[in-house]
Amino acid sequence: MTHAEQNKALWDSRADLGMSAGTNDVRAKRLEMRAISAKIEDGMRVLDIGCGNGITAVDLALTKRVDVIGIDHSEKMIAAAKTLAEKSLGCLTSAEFCVGSIDALPKGLGLFDVIYTERMLVNLPDWEEQASAIYSIGKMLRSGGKYLMVECSMDGLSALNDCRESVGLSRITPPEHTTYIDDASVDNLYVPGLRLERTIDFTSSYYFLSRVVNAWQAKQLGQEPSYDAPVNGLADTLPAIGSVGQVRMWVWQAR
């Protein structure tokens, strides 16, 4: 199977996992959802590329007065997203879902105030395809619109692993199906009509607590670390400190 076929098979198999469909770490997922929601205002037209089973898009439709479209290459994920929208939104039509991908976009989508990806680019096989995706996204933004690129950072993971090694923990390796974002490549990328506004390390406190402190405590007890450990919950109230979060938000603005 090709990389794309293997990737699709993986996400097809996870379509019915609810909040855990995109990641087993539900707390990390909620952090991502809050970070995205904070950048979206009422009245906006929003596109979620790689929407999975629609958790983030439906949440936006429930909590904001926005029109959101979600696309994903997994038919099973889209079916799950439509079911979730029907159960959560009833007769409301502020969220719609269709099969598609960054290299096979549905026709007639139009322009958007905000486009976001949530660990979608890392599922592409290399930086060349990731950069091409950013180019394509830039073309779908209205003037002044923003692309919220919520993706896994190689620099963030490296810094996190340095902390883990310093307390005797093994380094974390990225999942086999992913290509984490090279931060320097993003910083040096020129995209016509698009400007990199800022990078936000919004997960740093959480990953330090969960992957270093919690993991170290579990090791002392001879246990496997749990995503539900109480110490991980501190990140819900603490500000993001440092730059050891493996998920970052790159904020791009259309000129």
What does each model-found stretch correspond to?
Residues L47, N53-A104:
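Class I SAM-dependent methyltransferase SAM/SAH-binding core
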Residues E176-G193, T199:
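Short alpha-helix
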Residues L194-A229:
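Conserved catalytic loop of SAM-dependent methyltransferase domains
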Residues Y116:
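A conserved beta-strand element that flanks and buttresses the S-adenosyl-L-methionine
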Residues L141-Y147:
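Short glycine-dipeptide loop
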Residues M1-I40, I55, D59, L148-S170:
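Conserved class I S-adenosyl-L-methionine
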Residues L124-S136:
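A short, conserved alpha-helix within the catalytic core of class I
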